[in-house]
């Protein structure tokens, strides 16, 4: 298996799908590479594409606030990645073939990290990692064991910005996440 740096360098040169033709930057991921908690979003937006880092726009600011309420910080104790590493045009959902082209990158990140908990941020990542029929509005905040990793789906911050009345439910998801972290994680959170 490649090291983090080898994987990052290979990913930066990826040409596996057409998203490489319109990207400004590959958005590989950010955070502690040995974190026990990983967040997986859908795909980079415009700000993420420009900066090369996941969740840096308005959605990222809201995600940071939600995480901070339960003492999670991207530079301290979590890792954040996306289902696809390049921005889909017009911020559309990543197509299944684009997700498949990127799947080895994310699967290798997960294998290198060995997280205990993965938070699927939004429908796309939850349908990829929890269940193809996953419905965020019905199943958010619940934990699913997949090969020894606990997965939880929650609302994408962009959805919360469009529909603020879902913020209390998202906050409850993060409380459940904090409780699960305290139950099963070894690192100090």
Region annotations inferred by a language model:
Residues 1-189:
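A polyanion-binding, active-site-adjacent surface
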């Amino acid at each position: 298996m490649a090291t983090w740096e080898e994987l990052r360098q290979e990913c930066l040169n990826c040409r596996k799908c057409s998203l490489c033709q319109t990207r400004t930057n590959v958005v590989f991921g950010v955070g502690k590479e040995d974190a026990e908690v990983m967040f997986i979003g859908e795909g980079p937006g415009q700000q993420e594409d420009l900066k090369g880092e996941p969740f840096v726009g308005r959605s990222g600011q809201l995600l940071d606030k939600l995480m901070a309420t339960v003492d999670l910080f991207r530079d301290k104790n979590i890792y954040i990645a996306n289902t696809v590493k390049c921005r889909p045009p017009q911020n559309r959902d990543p197509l299944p073939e684009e997700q498949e082209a990127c799947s080895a990158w994310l699967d290798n990140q997960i294998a290198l990290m060995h997280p205990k908990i993965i938070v699927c941020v939004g429908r796309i990542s939850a349908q990829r990692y929890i269940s193809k029929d996953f419905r965020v509005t019905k199943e958010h905040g619940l934990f699913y064991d997949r090969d020894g990793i606990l997965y939880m789906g929650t609302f994408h911050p962009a959805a919360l910005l469009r529909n603020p009345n879902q913020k209390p439910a998202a906050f409850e998801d993060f409380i459940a996440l904090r409780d699960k972290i305290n139950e099963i994680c070894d690192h100090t959170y």
